[in-house]
Amino acid sequence: MARKIKPLIYVFCEGESEIEYTKYLKEKFEDVAVIQKPVKGLFEVADKKFKKDAKYRNNAEVTDEIWFFFDVDDGQTGSWDRIQKIVSTLKKLRKKPNIRVRLLMTTGCVEFWFLLHYKKVVPSIQTVAEKENILRLLQNECPGYVKGDSNTTRKIADHFKQASINGDWVLGLSLIHI
């Protein structure tokens, strides 16, 4: 029986916490996917790497997915029109089927996603004070958490199944109000 080829996934992140979380996923799911070491940077970085870096360019035809892990409202993503063009270009690097591009976006801050690993919450995350409150709530659940800390990020990531359930719950609430 032929061995199944694992999907190849490249990940681009904006912050240290996202990088640590992705490293956890890479180790946790190494039996089902080849997740490359995450790179700090988003759309322009990915575009440049797949155009100029031989490691990326030469693997484009065997790349299954490209993930972008970022906060939506921090202003670092730039123009959505420009992003859409880059995503379209990246998808077409592989002929058939195209590369699947996933936008793993958090609203406000990644700590909101991390908090969903513990409980169902729908906090306001508009101001700096509200983001600091999310951080405090997360630290109540995972004492010692600071952005980019590998140990606490891994403790949080261990609860990824609960985060998925709680995230679906949050999305269900937002659909009710449409």
Model regions: which residues?
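Helix N-cap/beta->alpha junction signal
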Residues: 13-15
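C-terminal accessory helical subdomains adjacent to catalytic cores in phosphodiester-
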Residues: 1-8, 19-36, 51-65, 72-176
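Eukaryotic endosomal/vacuolar membrane-trafficking regulators centered on PX-domain-mediated PI3P pathways
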Residues: 42-48
